A protein has these predicted regions:
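ABC family nucleotide-binding domain
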Residues: 21-238
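ABC-family P-loop ATPase nucleotide-binding domain
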Residues: 1-31, 242-264
């Protein structure tokens, strides 16, 4: 194909126009914790995550996985480097603007569901909307009820957390994370407090919601089976990020201590 200056441009060059938009980008991300001595955790992490991706972050305990997730969620600040969320450098935002960013653009799922015992499942799921807007609209309420029905809680939404199982509570937490229709969902060991069967069910729901919502999901996990089912696998090792293919991840798992699901 001829270019504007008469040169021939190959037709098979990769096109960025067809790629989903970047929702997370970090450059030179560093984090050092200061106590009696400086403890460096992240050493110049460069990362790009696009809308609709499902990314698993693996690594040994203490490698910085959760620290990275907290920085991506604007819950912590890096020592150096930049974080862009939906093309906004979050270092330029005020505290109020950061709070709005977290409310509007990012959903969080934690290992422990953190549902409030005094509220019903529906009220807990609506909590991000209530905090953001003061009161939900009929359309927002209907959407959240629809999500609860889709995750199998259509007949449970009136119950309180202590009346539901751990898996049901975590399903409610997934709906809560999606309540404000965020572009990014960050999950820190979302199945770590569940038995294997419940964990696999919760993960399957997360994958389904990822596909249907188009939100980018970023999940920290020690479960190599779940990491294998993600779209991408990122290893945090010695404070550095490295992309792992599935074959390499399986090989690392087999060469670990022999335990299944706890290799990272």
């Amino acid at each position: 194909m001829p270019g504007t200056n008469g040169r021939v441009i190959p037709d098979n060059l990769p096109s960025t126009a067809t790629q989903p938009p970047l929702v997370i980008e970090t450059r030179g991300l560093k984090k050092t914790f200061l106590s009696k001595i400086a403890v460096p955790v992240l050493h110049g992490v460069d990362l790009q995550i696009r809308s609709g991706e499902f990314v698993a972050i693996v690594g040994q305990s203490g490698s910085g996985k959760s620290t990275l997730l907290n920085i991506l969620g604007a819950l912590d600040v890096p020592t150096a480097g930049t974080v862009r969320i939906n093309d906004v450098d979050i270092a330029t935002l005020s505290e109020d603007e950061l709070a709005l960013l977290r409310s509007d653009e990012i959903g969080f799922i934690f290992q422990f569901h953190h549902l409030l015992d005094e509220f019903t499942c529906l009220e807990n799921a609506l909590m991000p909307i209530t905090i953001r807007y003061g009161e939900e609209t009929a359309a927002q309420r209907a959407r959240v009820i629809s999500l609860l029905q889709r995750v199998g809680l259509g007949d449970q939404w009136h119950k309180r957390p202590n009346e539901m199982s751990g898996g049901q509570n975590q399903r409610c937490a997934i709906v809560r994370a999606l309540a404000n229709a965020p572009k990014i969902v960050l999950a820190d060991e979302p199945t770590g407090n569940l038995d294997r069967h419940s964990g696999e069910e919760v993960f399957a729901l997360m994958r389904e919601m990822n596909r249907d919502s188009g939100a980018a999901f970023v999940m920290v996990t020690h479960d190599d089976r779940l990491a294998q089912a993600a779209g991408r696998i990122l290893l945090i090792e010695n404070g550095v990020r490295r992309e792992l293919g599935r074959a390499e991840h399986r090989a690392r798992t087999r060469s670990a201590d022999g335990s299944r699901g706890e290799a990272f």
